[in-house]
Regions:
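A short beta-sheet element
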Residues: 89-92, 96-147, 152-166
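Hydrophobic residues in beta-strands and at strand termini
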Residues: 31, 67, 113-114, 129, ...
């Protein structure tokens, strides 16, 4: 993990191991002195291996979330069970309170806090933030025009653009006190 701090010159620096480098060109905007910049990978489980389950062996009464159930902007449209959906294939397990982030076509901003436990398509990355950070704050930050523009400038794939794990874990997040 890295540590981000303000130097004597009042600009942000990042220390990784013994190496210190300036973040002056990477920090997108000023934040209040009491706030701090952190990397999403240091405050969340985004990069951790997710628990998988085959939908055919999952409890048919649990929620089975697909991308089409989430409207552009993150509003949940449908809440179908695995049985109702007749879901098949490998799915990712998530828990109530997890942030659900669609890595496929991220410009659609299909990001929300899970209202219940369930399983979802592997195109959705469930993750938790550590400590007392409100997941709704992170969801709103991820939907911000700054993050939206940044992520969409570095997606890969033409027909089905995706955002990579490294892009997300290195994302700078302003955290209030």
């Amino acid at each position: 993990p890295s540590v981000i701090f303000k130097g004597a010159d009042n600009t942000p620096y990042e220390k990784i191991g013994d190496e210190v480098r300036s973040l002056a060109d990477e920090v997108p905007f000023d934040i209040p002195d009491s706030w701090e910049w952190v990397r999403l990978g240091n405050i969340s489980s985004y990069a951790e291996t997710k628990q998988k389950v085959n939908a055919t062996s999952a409890d048919p009464s649990i929620w089975g979330l697909d991308l089409e159930d989430i409207e552009k902007g993150g509003r949940l449209l449908e809440h179908k069970t695995v049985g109702e959906r007749k879901a098949v294939g490998d799915k990712t397990v998530f828990a109530k309170g997890d942030i659900l982030y669609s890595k496929l076509r991220p410009y659609l901003l299909k990001i929300l806090v899970a209202p219940d436990d369930g399983i979802c398509t592997p195109e959705i990355v469930p993750f938790r933030v550590y400590g007392v950070i409100d997941p709704n704050y992170i969801v709103n930050y991820l939907k911000s025009p700054y993050v939206d523009n940044l992520i969409n400038s570095i997606t890969y794939g033409v027909k089905m653009p995706r955002v990579g794990t490294e892009t997300m874990t290195s994302l700078l997040v302003p955290v209030p006190p």
